[in-house]
């Protein structure tokens, strides 16, 4: 996984019902390979998954370093997570994360500034954190805001 050449998967992509998980796995693989670029593994957004699932980011990284595919990593997570959630709870958490908006003026101002810098000052559809991440990934790799 080379995140200097293309972005990680969208935070909206799900694995085992979890949003964020495929994206953080892409970042983990890139960190292991030394090709993380501007991305960060175990960033605050990733930690929301780790906290909810009850998974240690270093333990997960050890599993990923063994070359496991997404399905095998998910199986390891399900066996080793400290917070046992039902499918419904995972779906609700994922839906909440997917629709989460900046909760304070500082965060909202940060997103508005970054969207404007990307040439999207008139974009009224960038409301959630996931909207912002998708736009940022797109623009970073040559797309138009």
Q: Which sequence ranges carry the predicted segments?
A:
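A short structural micro-motif
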Residues: 67-71, 83-84, 99, 117
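Mature extracellular/secreted ectodomains of secretory-pathway proteins
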Residues: 70-79, 83-93
């Amino acid at each position: 996984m080379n995140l200097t050449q293309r972005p990680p998967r969208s935070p909206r992509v799900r694995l085992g019902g979890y949003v964020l998980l495929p994206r953080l796995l892409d970042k983990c693989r890139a960190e292991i390979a030394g090709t993380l670029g501007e991305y960060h593994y175990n960033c605050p957004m990733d930690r929301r998954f780790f906290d909810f699932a009850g998974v240690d980011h270093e333990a997960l990284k050890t599993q990923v370093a063994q070359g496991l595919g997404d399905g095998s990593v998910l199986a390891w997570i399900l066996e080793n997570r400290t917070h046992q959630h039902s499918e419904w709870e995972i779906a609700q958490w994922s839906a909440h994360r997917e629709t989460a908006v900046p909760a304070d003026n500082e965060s909202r101002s940060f997103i508005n500034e970054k969207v404007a810098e990307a040439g999207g000052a008139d974009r009224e559809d960038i409301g959630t954190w996931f909207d912002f991440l998708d736009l940022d990934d797109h623009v970073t790799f040559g797309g138009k805001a």
